[in-house]
Amino acid sequence: MLKRAGLLAAALSLCAAPIAAHAEDCGTIQLGAAVSMTGIYAANGHNTRDGYDFAVKKINSEGGVTIDGKCYKFEVKYYDDESNPARAAQLVERLIDQDKIQFMLGPYGSPLTKAILPVTEKYKTPVVQAEAASRSLFTQGYKYHFGIIATSEKYLTPLIDMAAQLAKKDGKDPSKLKIAMIYQDDVFSMDVRQGVMDEVKKYNITPILDDRMPKDLNDITGFLTKVKALKADVLIVSGHEKGAATAARQMGDMRVQVPIIAVTHCESAKIVSDFPKASEGMICPTQWDETMKASDKTFGTAMDFNNEFKAAYPEYKVVPYNVAQAAAAIIVWRDAFNRAQSLDQEKVREALTRTDLKTFYGGIKIAPDGSNPGKDVVLRQIQGGQYKVVWPEDVAAAQLEYPRSAQY
């Protein structure tokens, strides 16, 4: 951690130099966050925190925000929610009630975000979250909740369209596609499932398998046995990091060959490094990729962000989209304070409702329900151990390798 902090400080030192002499004159805007440093969401919790910290230091190095002629620097106070929703809610209440923090960042994951939102609403505390995609979070009428990422029902809808188009090119009827699905029984994965179910109806497809993962996410061999016996055309797995790792490991053990295999949470599950043969050719949905045509004045292009983050955090061989979207949340806060020209919670909340900006992460335009409906998901394929955007075709950086044929 000390090495990481030192590298980041060095990377930003030149940018910070012009304002260093006046740093002591700046006020502080404290943001609060309960983020998973331990427990089942720890991998993406660390990604989230690193994204927040990187953006805070970058924005502070450029002068932070100026409100009514006075400069302010961002600071984030963290607690470890231990991947426990009840604990997350307790800690957010502590941040607001005891630590007197008036502006919040979200935790990682829909279950934890679902737990904290009643607290932030109770205290009328604005929260900008970048790591919870469940559609249900935006149907409760919350007025202080703002999410910037594509909602989870969108994660694999492009996959169904892709599979249908490929079937047509092969002279096949898309309605005959044999789709096998298995999901973790949690808010996020059930939203992913619903999005798929809605999309397959457009092509009159009835999935041949629609199973649930066991609670411990340790074994899906029974499901994979059925997949092989039924000769599925498309295989879908959504089970966060542990589910993705289990799927990759057991597909390798069982030599599963399916023309299209899609898995969520590929990066944080480290399936490329841990299961290089089994993961080859898998399709992975993502909210962001460094090849995307998106930019802003702070981070430059998506590729610029990718390169600068890797220089500061060299332990990252691939920059997960969780890092990028966490950093984008800090940009949203800066934009809101700049437009509100106030530290008043209600004035800042009102500014958040009018968010409409372009960032290295993509466009962020907040809708009345607090979501960012213009954000879409793209599909990447693991090719030669690298993630390559392959769908939609108009943004693809590489040709889709189809059908998938893993060399076990």
Regions found by a protein language model. Give the residues of each.
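Extracellular/periplasmic periplasmic-binding protein-like sensory domains
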Residues: 251-327, 338, 387, 393-408
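Stable alpha-helical elements in mature extracytoplasmic
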Residues: 44, 48-55, 88-92, 100, ...
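Signal peptide-proximal N-terminal region
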Residues: 24-26, 50-76, 168-170, 174, ...
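Extracytoplasmic ligand/sensor domains, especially the bilobed periplasmic-binding protein
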Residues: 101-209, 259-284
